[in-house]
């Protein structure tokens, strides 16, 4: 079972448009999602990344903008643009939130 580790490859090209294709894979290409609940949790995490709130519940600027995503059994595709933090920090935030779920 995955959820112990999500791996992403380092960016190989700099996007002049600021839009990046990110691929997250399961460790050793293992399953990322075991059931519908796992998929829903991942989508909830994406929503939290694009609609963050402070400790008082007030909205904060988004960490990124997500244009598209595709949840596969053993990997995930995300098309995103940087927001208030660097892409690598956002990808790490997404990965850690799902791993800790």
Positions of PLM-derived features:
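Short catalytic/metal-binding and nucleic-acid-binding patches
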Residues: 1-101
